[in-house]
């Protein structure tokens, strides 16, 4: 494949054009009066969304150089979404403002490396300042407030608040589609842990990037599974029963994993392989916990149970299992209730007895997993499109609530960012030359999110930025009510983790764009005849 290469200013300009195209599409969704974006789908009706990252994921540009810029900003949005579940639009708008301000200076002869260093230092300073000014979040109402801001829906916000309070900070909140029109909250017995599928080929729900197994059987294995002859007899028995299979083992590799993947692709057997969490004795103990929850047995050569000899009687079961790339949730395990209750009692006794803090902490983690249960938010809506959008916004709200409990909250509406400019004064004084200019670029960019929140609400962005800069900390524009005031009291808040991720991720991408000297892309294939582009000739 031959390549086309662009250099310095031309390369940067093209990348900037791509950054702008993507950011302009995403920024209309920012704020409580953010607009919707309609996405045409290859199959089925169009999707309507006001979630920045969903819009960003859909965009690929025709010009290969511009597309580089768009993909860079897309990575900012996705990264921020992965860490904090929200704040994607803020990150995108910040990145756009940084690229614009930075490239202006580079074109005027500033040193991009020094500029980039200044931008990074500024991002760190703002991130620290945000952390320092955060208000901790606890209690159902506070959590509900965060979730309400994220989902723009009070009822959903309160559901998330209730769910989080019930299952605790480490508890699992799972979001499912309901078969009715109502959105409701259920608490079920369930266990979640931080290990995801071993291969993306196991995914069954491509939009959510999850493998969902309904009414599966569960194989728990103490050691590695790599040889196919060991696993095959079990796979054949499970395939006959027609049930999906979840395998949790120290590791699944080689032929065994390859066979599971091939069967998943061919749809002959719905299976998902997951590594067991933790190490050594903790892993052993946790597998035993899972065995009790699911009503299965841990297959362990040490106790004379060999994988190739056992039948389906050692398998556990559950109502539903959801596996993503990072975690696994087992809902309503088939184990006996009293066995689980006894195990919980036993763990509590061990916690009382132990004198090692580390052991106590780990035992408490296991206890929380066993006793905490799973909150299931069942989302209902009138149409397929509305259901999708609603489910997305509940997932974002849960992520935002978790982030808020972790690091606290700051005033929302773009004002915390704008007011974090004060943290840059000292830094600016200690730097000189192009690094100091980098700090200026960053200070300028911090007004961008507020500018677009105000613009989307039909106000003059520049006026709003000027006004909020004069207000005391924690005060700003409430774009919902179109008034200025105390945002935290009004419940216009953002999790600090979300805002910080947006700041740090946008700075790292801007720095990349500024220091780009050469861009290399594939040469587009020439069309053999012009059927493909017939519509240009009318």
Swiss-Prot record:
Biological processes annotated in GO: protein refolding
Key words, A-Z: ATP-binding, Chaperone, Cytoplasm, Isomerase, Nucleotide-binding
Localization (cell): Cytoplasm
Reaction equation(s) it catalyzes: ATP + H2O + a folded polypeptide = ADP + phosphate + an unfolded polypeptide
Pfam families noted in UniProt: Cpn60_TCP1
Main location: cytoplasm
Chain positions recorded as ATP binding sites: 29-32, 86-90, 413, 494
Signal peptide: none
Example GO molecular function: ATP binding
A GO cellular-component term linked to this record: cytoplasm
InterPro entries named in the record: Chaperonin_Cpn60_CS (IPR018370), Cpn60/GroEL (IPR001844), Cpn60/GroEL/TCP-1 (IPR002423), GroEL-like_apical_dom_sf (IPR027409), GROEL-like_equatorial_sf (IPR027413), TCP-1-like_intermed_sf (IPR027410)
EC code(s) of this entry: 5.6.1.7
Function: Together with its co-chaperonin GroES, plays an essential role in assisting protein folding. The GroEL-GroES system forms a nano-cage that allows encapsulation of the non-native substrate proteins and provides a physical environment optimized to promote and accelerate protein folding.
Family under the similarity heading: Belongs to the chaperonin (HSP60) family.
Protein name: Chaperonin GroEL 1
The gene coding this protein: groEL1
């Amino acid at each position: 494949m031959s390549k086309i290469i662009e250099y310095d200013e031309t390369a940067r300009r093209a990348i900037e054009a791509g950054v702008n195209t993507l950011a302009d599409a995403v920024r209309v969704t920012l704020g409580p009066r953010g607009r919707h974006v309609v996405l045409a789908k290859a199959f089925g009706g169009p999707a309507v969304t006001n979630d920045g990252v969903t819009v960003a994921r859909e965009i690929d540009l025709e010009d290969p150089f511009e597309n580089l810029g768009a993909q860079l900003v897309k990575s900012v949005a996705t990264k921020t979404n992965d860490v904090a579940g929200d704040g994607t639009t803020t990150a995108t708008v910040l990145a756009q403002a940084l690229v614009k301000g930075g490239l202006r200076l580079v074109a005027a002869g500033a040193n991009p490396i020094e500029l980039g260093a200044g931008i990074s230092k500024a991002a760190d300073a703002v991130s620290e300042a945000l952390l320092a000014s955060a208000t901790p979040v606890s209690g159902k109402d506070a959590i509900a407030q965060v979730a309400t801001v994220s989902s723009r829906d009070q009822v959903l916000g309160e559901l998330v608040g209730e769910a989080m309070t019930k299952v605790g900070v480490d508890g699992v909140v799972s979001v499912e589609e309901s078969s009715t029109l109502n959105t409701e909250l259920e608490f079920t017995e369930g266990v979640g842990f931080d290990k995801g599928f071993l291969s993306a080929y196991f995914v069954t729900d491509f939009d959510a990037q999850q493998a969902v197994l309904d009414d599966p059987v569960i194989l728990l294995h103490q050691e590695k599974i790599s040889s196919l002859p060991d696993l095959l007899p079990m796979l054949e028995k499970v395939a006959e029963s027609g049930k999906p299979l979840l395998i949790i083992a120290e590791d699944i590799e080689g032929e065994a994993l390859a066979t599971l993947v091939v069967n998943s692709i061919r749809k002959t057997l719905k299976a998902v392989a997951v590594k067991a969490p933790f190490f050594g004795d903790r892993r052993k103990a946790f597998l035993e916990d899972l065995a009790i929850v699911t009503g299965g047995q841990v297959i362990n050569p040490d106790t004379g149970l060999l994988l190739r000899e056992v039948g389906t009687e050692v398998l556990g079961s559950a109502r539903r299992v959801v596996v993503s790339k990072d975690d696994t949730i087992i809902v309503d395990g088939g184990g006996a209730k009293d066995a689980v209750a006894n195990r919980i009692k036993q763990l509590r006794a061990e916690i009382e007895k132990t004198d090692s803090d580390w052991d106590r902490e780990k035992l408490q983690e296991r206890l929380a997993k066993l006793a905490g249960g799973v909150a299931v938010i069942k989302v209902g809506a009138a149409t397929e499109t509305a259901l999708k959008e609603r489910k997305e916004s509940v997932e974002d709200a849960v992520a935002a609530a978790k982030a808020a409990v972790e690091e606290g909250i700051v005033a929302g509406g773009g004002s915390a960012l704008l007011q974090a400019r004060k943290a840059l004064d000292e830094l600016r004084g200690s730097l000189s030359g192009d690094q100091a200019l980098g700090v200026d670029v960053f200070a300028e960019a911090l007004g961008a999110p507020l500018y677009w929140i105000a613009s989307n609400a039909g106000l003059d962005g520049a006026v709003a930025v000027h006004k909020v800069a004069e207000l005391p900390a924690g005060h700003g524009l409430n774009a919902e009510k179109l008034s200025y005031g105390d945002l935290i009291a009004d419940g216009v808040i953002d999790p600090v983790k979300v805002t910080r991720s947006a700041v740090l991720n946008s700075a790292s991408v801007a720095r990349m764009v500024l220091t780009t000297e050469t861009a290399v892309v594939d040469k587009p294939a020439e069309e053999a005849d012009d059927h493909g582009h017939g519509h240009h000739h009318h």
